[in-house]
């Protein structure tokens, strides 16, 4: 598997050759397909080296990273056409892909931590370098400080873990039992902020609103999943305390998900609405992981993959409108069925997937999470009813406001959509719905 890492690394010199944008794009898709074909060879645990290896969970998230990074280049046609440092832009995407590959395949907690934090740097460069408004500086500061405030305590905890157990190697780590309550809090907080959990989520809508399309895609598609993956990995170290105190995180995330759903009703910014809906979906993932049962972990896994494809597709749709009308406001982006009738079909398909209707992967994930959380506490159905219902309400609100009604009077006409854009949307939607037919993949 080290060969894939080398192949990505050798794409970097191509970035600085003249007019190699689409060559790199094609090679990244080729790499994604080759990686996908090799799945059955690496379905079980597989070692790359002493510090690197991956299992079922990390393999799928690496594949998602390959796929989303390839689609980021497809979506960023405007960067290529404007020639605004397009070579450096592709270099950042490849560097980010290497960081994600190393994060998901790390078997050592310290190397996982280093690559986990390193993925922040290229994301920040994407927001600051190719964002649209001057407020992107504030969004970048939010992103850095929210993430780093919880990361320093996590580093100190890792040093203490090494002192106690003399190793940071995942398979050899043991449960610390009833000691070190602060271990439990500090170890979870860095990952919960990354997901993000309600109350520490304010950086996400800001980052989404100010980020270019590529930044929003990788942020919603993969970087949020780093938090869930981290919780999944460290759960066994603190499972004893988790049995006692996880109810707090479950309650907070589920109630927070309902509150965030209400916040979605008040949004008039399209990207902000999709960003807040990510927080609502991730609240169910946190709830499922914290129950620490098989249904919860597998449901979180499938919802993370489904949400990564679905929210990335929705950001692509909002960007397609933004490139034509120059606004993200729902007050201006209305009646789009009159201007772009073919694109309305894609809005409907992604909106229906976002509210977890069949045959999307989100449905499979949400059903598993409902099963998991209800088996943990029957009374949680009171919150889950509202969470599932309002998820459909704000998605339909977004769809109906943006597509129906009279269009903005100052807009006379616009392009119906390029082949590149429809191709991009198809490559998001197809795996999102076809994977539902391969349900056993997520429940081994």
Positions of the model-derived regions?
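Core, highly hydrophobic multi-pass alpha-helical transmembrane subunits of bioenergetic inner membranes
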Residues: 1-444
């Amino acid at each position: 598997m080290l060969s894939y890492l080398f192949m990505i690394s050798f794409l970097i010199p191509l970035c600085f050759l003249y007019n190699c944008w689409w060559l790199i794009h094609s090679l990244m898709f080729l790499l994604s397909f080759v990686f996908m074909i090799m799945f059955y060879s690496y379905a079980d645990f597989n070692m790359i080296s002493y510090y690197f290896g991956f299992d079922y969970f990390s393999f799928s998230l690496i594949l998602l990273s390959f796929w989303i990074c390839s689609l980021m280049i497809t979506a960023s046609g405007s960067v290529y056409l404007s020639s605004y440092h397009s070579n450096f832009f592709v270099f950042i995407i490849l560097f980010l892909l290497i960081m994600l590959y190393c994060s998901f395949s790390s078997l050592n907690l310290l190397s996982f931590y280093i690559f986990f934090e390193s993925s922040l740097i290229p994301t920040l460069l994407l927001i600051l370098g190719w964002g649209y408004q001057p407020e992107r500086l504030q969004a970048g500061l939010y992103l850095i400080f929210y993430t780093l405030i919880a990361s320093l305590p996590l580093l100190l905890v890792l040093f203490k873990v090494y002192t106690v157990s003399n190793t940071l190697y995942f398979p050899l780590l043991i449960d610390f039992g009833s000691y070190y309550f602060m271990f439990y809090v500090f170890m979870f907080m860095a990952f919960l902020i990354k997901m993000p959990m309600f109350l520490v989520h304010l950086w996400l809508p800001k980052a989404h609103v100010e980020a270019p399309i590529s930044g929003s895609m990788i942020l919603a598609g993969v970087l949020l999943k780093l938090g869930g993956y981290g919780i999944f990995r460290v759960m066994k170290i603190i499972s004893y305390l988790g049995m006692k105190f996880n109810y707090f995180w479950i309650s907070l995330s589920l109630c927070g998900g309902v509150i965030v759903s209400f916040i979605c009703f008040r949004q008039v910014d399209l990207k902000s609405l999709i960003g807040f809906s990510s927080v609502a979906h991730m609240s169910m993932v946190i709830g499922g992981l914290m129950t620490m049962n098989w249904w919860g972990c597998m449901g979180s896994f499938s919802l993370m993959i489904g949400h990564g494809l679905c929210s990335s597709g929705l950001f692509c749709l909002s960007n397609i409108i933004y490139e034509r009308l120059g606004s993200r406001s729902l007050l201006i982006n209305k009646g789009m069925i009159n201007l772009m009738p073919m694109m309305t079909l894609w809005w409907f398909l992604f909106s229906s997937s976002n509210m977890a209707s069949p045959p999307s992967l989100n449905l499979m994930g949400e059903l598993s999470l409902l099963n998991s959380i209800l088996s943990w506490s029957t009374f949680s159905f009171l919150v889950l009813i509202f969470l599932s219902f309002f998820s459909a309400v704000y998605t339909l609100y977004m769809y109906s406001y943006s597509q129906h009604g009279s269009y903005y009077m100052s807009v006379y006409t616009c392009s119906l959509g390029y082949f590149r854009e429809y191709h991009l949307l198809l490559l998001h939607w197809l795996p999102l719905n076809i994977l539902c037919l391969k349900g056993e993949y997520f429940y081994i």
